[in-house]
Amino acid sequence: MSQDSAAVPPLDSSRSTVPPIVQLRKVDKDYQLGKVLVPALHEIDLDIQPGEFTVIAGPSGSGKTTLLNLIGCVDVASRGQVTVDGRDTGKLSEKALTQLRLDKLGFIFQSFNLVGVLDAFQNIEFPLLLQKTLGKKERHARVQALLEKVGIAQYAHHRPGELSGGQRQRVAIARALVTQPRIVLADEPTANLDSTTGTAILDLMQELNRQGTTFLFSTHDPRVVSRAGRVVRLIDGRVVDDQATAAEVATAMAIH
């Protein structure tokens, strides 16, 4: 197996003296649907150490996306504590949450969440404009480099409506990476990609992971699971397995 495709060794968080970059304690999430209260997550305890390449696995409806949304500060827990980069997100103002997302987090949404009136280049550049830390030359150089790395430089000036699902997925991936975040949250990042493109994107993510970026995925894709250093399995909103070997889970997912 090549270095790029090899699984990242799992981190033993019980032995680490480095504070977790993400920590959840007794986290519940409920949704109100009319008069019915629907539980989505139940008493989640989870530590993610800096530099992990971790997969959240589980069937549809198990709570994977909900968990990422809580960590990504785009939703709030019903009960419990979510800490990201040392900050208790439940105690932050909306302005502080926005700044935390902008400075520390990159989020690859399953639904892309691209701005329809902006072209691919502008969508990727947008977080840098919000950050206001780079000049125009530096911004454009960074965006162009990512367009080339994800293989869509020729579509830089196409709007989302002019792109295929796979091309929009790659724009979303580049946008999540452009601020060089400490943590990347990826919700089914390979779902719209063919095998060759998916492999190239995962290679890029593992390269960034080796440079220190923390990655947390939700996925059904055995290709992603097989590369993980750690796999956390959810069923019905509960953690049922943690630190399972990637090979075992990938094999089970391929069979079922």
Question: What is each residue range found by the language model?
Answer:
Residues 1-30, 241-256:
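ABC-family P-loop ATPase nucleotide-binding domain
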Residues 19-228, 234:
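ABC family nucleotide-binding domain
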